[in-house]
């Protein structure tokens, strides 16, 4: 991951977790999703002091026939933010106070852009934060399933285990081999 070396250099514990994922590939706007997640992870790195922790979690929340809802969560033990500021967090040029801008830099545009991109993707972005404790950002988006996923789901419905198969060949070894393969 792009963030492991940066986290290590800053003395942070960084880990990733994958929960409930049934697919390896999804269809969606990978460029925009990457932009959103990189921004949130960059903020977590920026606002988490040495010795802190950042966790990136991907969870499949639900799955339909042709799409699935995924939740990307970034949680940190950073500086957190006040409840009042959280209401304005996704507005352009917003930073909690001038000292934040001086100490950490930034324009206050990143999360406003993230919010717009997530909305354009038909998803949502939320934050839960406690000042002095840390923050948790959740991005929920619906992504399409690949043809392979769709076929695999439909194959599962056929329940091949209940079917009988006739294997015919003039070579007994070939028949035994085919029988072994089909029994799995």
Regions found by a protein language model. Give the residues of each.
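Short alpha-helical segment within the cytosolic histidine kinase core of two-component systems
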Residues: 1-9, 180
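Disordered, acidic interdomain junction associated with two-component signaling
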Residues: 9, 17, 63, 67, ...
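Short helix-loop "hinge" at the ATP-lid/N-box region of the Bergerat-fold HATPase_c
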Residues: 44-45
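Glycine-rich ATP-binding loops of the HATPase_c
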Residues: 122-128
């Amino acid at each position: 991951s792009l963030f492991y070396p940066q986290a290590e250099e800053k003395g942070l514990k960084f880990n990733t977790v994958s929960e409930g994922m049934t697919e390896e590939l999804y269809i969606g706007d990978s460029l925009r999703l990457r932009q959103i997640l990189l921004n949130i992870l960059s903020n977590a790195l920026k606002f988490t002091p040495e010795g802190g922790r950042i966790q990136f979690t991907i969870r499949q929340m639900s799955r339909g026939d042709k799409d699935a809802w995924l939740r990307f969560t970034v949680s940190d033990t950073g500086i957190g933010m006040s409840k009042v500021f959280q209401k304005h967090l996704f507005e352009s040029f917003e930073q909690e106070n001038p000292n934040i801008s001086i100490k950490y830099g930034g324009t206050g545009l990143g999360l406003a852009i993230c919010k717009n991109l997530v909305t354009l993707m038909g998803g949502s972005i939320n934050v839960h934060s406690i000042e002095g404790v840390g923050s948790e950002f959740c991005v929920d988006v619906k992504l399409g399933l690949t043809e392979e996923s769709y076929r695999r789901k439909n194959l599962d419905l056929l329940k091949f285990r209940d079917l009988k198969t006739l294997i015919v060949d003039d070579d007994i070894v070939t028949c035994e081999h085919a029988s072994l393969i089909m029994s799995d």
